């Protein structure tokens, strides 16, 4: 049990604010997480190459910088998961303001965006959506958030790449879902109980 706990502490360090800490692409490119990342890559490669599940795509979350994007793509290729090979597509979660602001540069390394509107809104407005004090300010329809959403969508459309959105916003606000469609979004995730109203 002690050894298991040590490994857990290595891969899941305690942080004051894990939401902004060791997660996403930063974890994948870290030497401390390398064994786990390689194991995940082997599992994906086996599913695609040996089991014939070539419909499996890869999605990379929380990519902070363009250099981090480049590095994670390189590591995937080194582990036998090369973008474009055997139809492999690698999508990036667009959930940081920097992702929308530098969308064209990030898209050089990926086959499209899945926009994570929850994190994008939280980080754009600088608030904790789980806070009982400021969570009432959380709104994906805020003009600043919509400006970033528009930038990300238009960059994908311009590049001829996929763009979809996941997050609570379209389920809570049918007007936002309509606006997203007008902007050119390809897919929208919805809660089951909101499909008819949003449709």
Which stretches of residues belong to each language-model region?
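Conserved alpha/beta-domain cores
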Residues: 2-199
């Amino acid at each position: 049990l002690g050894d298991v706990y040590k490994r857990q502490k290595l891969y899941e360090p305690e942080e004051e604010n894990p939401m902004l800490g060791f997660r996403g692409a930063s974890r994948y490119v870290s030497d401390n997480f390398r064994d786990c990342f390689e194991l995940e890559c082997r599992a994906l490669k086996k599913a695609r190459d040996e089991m014939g599940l070539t419909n499996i795509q890869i999605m990379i979350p929380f990519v902070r910088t363009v250099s981090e994007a480049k590095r994670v793509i390189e590591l995937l290729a080194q582990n036998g998961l090369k973008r474009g090979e055997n139809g492999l597509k690698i999508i990036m979660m667009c959930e940081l303001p920097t992702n929308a602001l530098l969308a064209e540069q990030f898209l050089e390394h990926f086959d499209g965006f899945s926009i994570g509107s929850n994190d994008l809104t939280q980080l754009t407005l600088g608030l904790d959506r789980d806070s009982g004090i400021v969570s009432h300010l959380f709104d994906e329809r805020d003009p600043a958030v919509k400006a970033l959403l528009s930038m990300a969508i238009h960059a994908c459309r311009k590049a001829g790449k996929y763009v979809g959105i996941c997050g609570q916003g379209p389920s809570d606000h049918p007007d936002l879902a309509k606006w997203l469609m007008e902007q050119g979004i390809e897919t929208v995730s919805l809660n089951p109980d909101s499909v008819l109203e949003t449709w």
